[in-house]
Regions:
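Flexible ATP-lid and adjacent glycine-rich G1/G2 motifs of the Bergerat
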Residues: 79-84, 88-161
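Short, flexible loop/turn elements at secondary-structure junctions
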Residues: 43, 60-64, 95-100, 141-143, ...
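Charged regulatory segments coupled to nucleotide-binding catalytic modules in large multidomain enzymes
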Residues: 1-11, 246-256, 260-273, 305, ...
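Active-site-adjacent bridging/hinge elements
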Residues: 2-17, 90, 108-124, 205-215, ...
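Bergerat-fold GHKL ATPase/HATPase_c domain
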Residues: 1-94, 102-116
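Short helix/loop capping segments that flank catalytic or ligand/cofactor-binding pockets
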Residues: 46, 66-69, 101-104, 161-162, ...
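GHKL-type ATPase core
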Residues: 54, 62-69, 73-78, 134-296
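Long, low-complexity, polar/charged, intrinsically disordered or flexibly structured peripheral segments
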Residues: 103-106, 111-115, 160-219, 223, ...
């Protein structure tokens, strides 16, 4: 292959400047590689029909240094001298069911082609709607993984409908360092950038990818890489001469934690794919296109291989993206006003969250698994207590970041040492903006444009000269919903494994004030021995027993005693919380949970009470949920048994059943 050295000129890039374009020092280099490489592959698979997944395989191969170096004109001896005396490794990234490096071999005839954007161009933004890439700078991470040498191989269907193998090589190095690899010319300023391929013409210094299949197979064989065969389309990027120990430099955020994946590059990459692509990896429920069929060294990453945290994140993502009811997580709609064409309750998206125990995350002996903070390379800023962990993601399924403090977590309460609050926000990407511009027409485009080049955060932007605050409103709504939920709801404490959800028998607790006691909609029968709650005027309301019916409804048997001066009474359902009871009106308020009240009365009866009660009136909430019944009473003392049946759509809450007498001095009347 013949060499083409980039000329250094006005407004041109140099190797040194390219290597600094996306110098993200917050993430390990292997995380940056996984985020960029997998996203490129997923973007390349968007328009290929006939497949429900995008195949991505990342792994390590041996390098035959002399066999590889002989093909690179101008640096053959230098490579053999520098690397020939010791075993060398390469990282490869393979994708299939993708378009490949299409376009004219000579990029001058197709400057917007895939082949130019990946091999010969820089800062070429990805324009496909819903794509992950946007700035065109992320691919510079390839040059930082090894010595700056990258091999691009692709098998495509060309413009003539013929299958074609293509291969090119790029080298980007810091031209300011001593002992550079690219040969120097006395007549030219070093640029630090070179390509290898075949000459466009005998009298030109420009190169294009080679298409000689025999030569391509020989080059790939020197890198222990198999070519694509038959009709299989895709791309393989090979980065030779890596230093595995250098790539595994540890970020000692949690130095005492167990991190077995940091022992070798392949294991680290396997966890990194889970870390950043949990929503899409092996997820056949992914709603925005093809799921990610991930492999490490040719072995498929199955869900059984996931760390527990990442499997939970995927299930939470599905719950938020689909909006399905779930007994495992809390899912809240996020609504933003004044920016979108409609004001549906979930116009901005949904947030799913839950508090996990150490046992649920396999952190206890004998497994002794890592904490959530260790899994995502984040520090717990609170020390003895556990800070909340917030993830957010947009349509391509790559988690943008994990936050444990800052704007996403501000005001959220810490959990105790044995619990971890984990949340994920999934935007409603298709929501249209009220006043769009040519580039930003929906929420997905807004969030995409708001990202920095390394896609690690969202920040509000200006559209048509007007500053928007959509991201800030989303963060504020997410915080408020999570905070209100745990202030207004008593979380399920049942034992829940990864694949099964077992309901435990809980205790029926007395309410903090008023008459009545709680009926636990989440417990399958049983409870503490009931005790009567009496007033000084002789009124009382006692839960005698409760049981689940075959329909899933809860049947509550109670005993009631009412004095002569009680003219009527109301039996009402509330949701119990640490701060007191929550009525249906308060629950459904936009300033509170904002969803239909989860507990609904289906039947109430009083056996053997003929002539004791008068008219009854059902009371429904604003969202038509029957949550209370008011019943008139004769002017005589009454002592009777009653039966109330209700169902509850949210197992994360505990229902409180109260009786409110009217005409009673005790009741303030």
């Amino acid at each position: 292959m013949q060499i083409e050295v980039a000329e250094f000129g006005k407004m041109s890039q140099s190797g040194n400047s390219l290597l600094k374009l996306i110098q993200n020092n917050d993430l390990p280099i292997l995380d940056l590689l996984v985020r960029e490489a997998v996203q490129n592959s997923l973007d390349a698979g968007m328009k290929v029909e006939g497949h429900d997944s995008v195949h991505v395989d990342i792994g390590i191969k041996d390098v035959d240094v002399p066999g590889f170096a002989k093909h690179l004109d101008g640096i053959t001896e230098r490579l053999i001298e520098k690397f020939g005396d010791s075993p060398q490794k390469a990282i490869y990234i393979e994708d299939a069911n993708t378009t490949g490096l299409t376009g004219s071999l000579d990029f001058k005839y197709s400057p917007n082609s895939n082949i130019f954007k990946l091999i010969y161009g820089i800062s070429m933004a990805q324009e496909t709607p819903g794509a992950g890439g946007s700035w065109g700078l992320g691919k510079t991470v390839y040059f930082r993984v090894g010595i700056g040498l990258v091999v691009y191989y692709s098998h495509i269907l060309n413009e003539d409908g013929q299958y074609q193998h293509r291969l090119a090589v790029t080298l980007v190095e810091n031209e300011k360092l001593p002992n550079t690899i690219i040969p120097k010319s006395n007549e030219k300023v070093p640029s630090g950038i070179a390509w290898w391929g075949q000459r466009v013409s005998p009298d030109s210094d420009d190169t294009i990818p080679i298409t000689d299949e025999a030569m391509i197979r020989d080059i790939l064989d020197s890198l222990s890489i198999q070519p694509f065969e038959g009709e299989r389309l895709g791309t393989k990027i090979i980065i030779p001469f890596i230093d595995e120990q250098q790539l595994l430099i540890k970020h000692d955020i949690n130095p005492d934690d167990n991190k077995p994946w940091e022992s070798n590059v392949a294991d680290y990459i396997g966890v990194a794919i889970q870390r950043w692509y949990a929503p899409r990896l092996a997820n056949k429920k992914y709603t925005y296109g093809k799921y990610l069929d991930g492999h490490i060294n040719g072995q498929r990453l199955e869900k059984d291989d996931f760390l527990p945290l990442f499997l939970e994140l995927q299930m939470m993502y599905n719950a938020a993206a689909i909006g399905s009811k779930t007994s495992r997580y809390i899912v809240n709609d996020i609504q933003i006003r004044n920016y979108f064409e409609h004001n549906k309750v979930n116009n901005a998206g949904r947030v799913a969250y839950r508090k996990f125990t150490k046992k649920e995350l396999d952190m206890l002996a004998p497994l002794n698994g890592p904490s959530p903070y260790t899994c995502v390379n984040e520090k717990n800023p609170l020390g003895e207590q556990n800070a909340p962990m917030m993830a957010y993601v947009r349509r391509p399924g790559m988690i943008i970041n994990y936050e444990t403090d800052g704007e996403w977590c501000k005001g959220l309460h810490a959990t105790e040492e044995s619990e971890y609050l984990v949340a994920i926000f999934v935007p409603n990407s298709n929501t249209k903006l009220m006043n769009p511009d040519n580039e930003v027409v929906d929420l997905e485009a807004y969030l995409r444009k708001s990202e920095m080049a390394d896609h690690t955060s969202w920040a509000d932007i200006i559209i048509k000269g007007k500053p928007f605050d959509i991201v800030e409103k989303i963060r504020s709504q997410v915080r408020r919903k999570i905070k209100a939920s745990y202030e207004n709801k008593e979380e399920v404490k049942g034992k829940q494994g990864l694949n099964t959800l077992a309901r435990n028998v809980g205790k029926m607790l007395l309410p903090p004030t008023g008459f009545g006691r709680r009926a636990s909609s989440r417990n399958r029968g049983g409870g503490t021995k009931p005790t009567a709650n009496k007033s000084s005027r002789g009124n009382s309301f006692t839960i005698v027993s409760q049981k689940y019916l075959d329909t899933g409804d809860l049947e509550v048997h109670f005993q009631m005693r009412l004095s002569k001066n009680v003219s009527a009474f109301t039996i009402e359902l509330f949701i119990a919380s640490e701060g007191g009871k929550i009525s249906a009106t308060d629950w459904e308020s936009e300033d509170s949970v904002g969803t239909p009240f989860p507990a609904k009365i289906t039947r109430i009866s009083f056996p053997d009470t003929v002539g004791l009660f008068g008219r009854s009136a059902a009371q429904k909430s604003n969202r038509k949920v029957l949550h209370a019944v008011r019943i008139e009473k004769i002017s005589e003392p009454v002592e009777c048994l009653g039966i109330l049946v209700f169902n509850c759509t949210d197992p994360h809450v505990q229902v409180e059943m109260l009786m409110k007498p009217e005409g009673s001095v005790v009741n303030g009347q």
